[in-house]
């Protein structure tokens, strides 16, 4: 089968369905692909194709995730759907499937349920920037007042977690009826697609963000100076520009005097490229793996942050026993491990393998970080958990 050429003409946006079990996330995913394929072209995906989600590994954690793609006239979407609640938790925390926006599915027959709340909270913690609500199964509710009530509850819940509950689009539909080809419900899927286009802003591309390169290796080249190597995470570095070396030690300024890739000299290094950057006036021993090279002032070193963490179960190769408040594992950021201590939420005495939990982490060395940075929790090089920086404290 020949691969279709990927058309780069339209903006690309990553979305996903979230919400309580059996509220119709997967049916909606199937309905979106089917109705949009019928309306705008593209290929439909059946419910069972999406439901049999393949296993993936992200940061050593196995996650079942389905990826589908669809197009509106304005955009190309990559959409992620997970079969089980645990898969959502893992997916959102590891950032395996980053979402520029999420479709929160709430069954009109049930209203918001515990996982509805948990997914909204997770979305807030891990930095899902926009939510759109699809009220599903509206064909099964005759009472207009009941629909109003459910909508109000969902909006209040979103506002509780700092989403703009009053402004978020709420579409009342029926994924199943749309999938079965009933025109009035198909129209609701088109309405949803319209909101995906208009309500979720086009994401900023990695190349347009401020320059950052996690340092993997440091060499000294006689007569030329010190070279650091790594993959540019975002932005562009040009020869002659000032850069900062951030993390672990005090922040130091330098100038990029050369960029090379595969032994060839370039005038810049761009997001996604593996490059060597030559630094002026820096000694080999002043710099180490785990620091980052960044645009001056764009990122700061921190030691303390609030995080959302998933602890691997025994079956996933994680711990066999719970841990308690004196726990001191390593936190692996980008290219290096840093030891840290943890503070558990009030009333939580221990954390079991397979749990997800909010915790405050204090590191023994500062690391360059922003909200949304992902990390692994390790014990002697073995991954036992995954986390995301929800909020930098100090």
Swiss-Prot record:
Describe its function. GTP hydrolase that promotes the GTP-dependent binding of aminoacyl-tRNA to the A-site of ribosomes during protein biosynthesis.
> What's the family?
Belongs to the TRAFAC class translation factor GTPase superfamily. Classic translation factor GTPase family. EF-Tu/EF-1A subfamily.
Renumbered residue ranges of the record's region G2? 60-64
Write down the PANTHER family for this protein, in alphabetical order: ELONGATION FACTOR TU, MITOCHONDRIAL, ELONGATION FACTOR TU-RELATED
Q: Does the keyword Protease apply?
A: no
Q: What is this protein called?
A: Elongation factor Tu
* Organism name: Pectobacterium atrosepticum (strain SCRI 1043 / ATCC BAA-672)
Q: Where is this region: G1?
A: 19-26
Q: Which UniProt keywords apply?
A: Cytoplasm, Elongation factor, GTP-binding, Hydrolase, Magnesium, Metal-binding, Nucleotide-binding, Protein biosynthesis
Q: What class of enzyme is it?
A: hydrolase
GO CC entries: cytosol
Which positions bind Mg(2+)? 26
Start and end residues of each stretch annotated as G3: 81-84
- From the UniProt record, list the reaction(s) this protein catalyses: GTP + H2O = GDP + phosphate + H(+)
Q: Where in the cell is it found?
A: Cytoplasm
Chain segments carrying region G4: 136-139
Q: Where is this region: G5?
A: 174-176
Which GO molecular function terms does the record list? GTP binding; GTPase activity; guanosine tetraphosphate binding; translation elongation factor activity
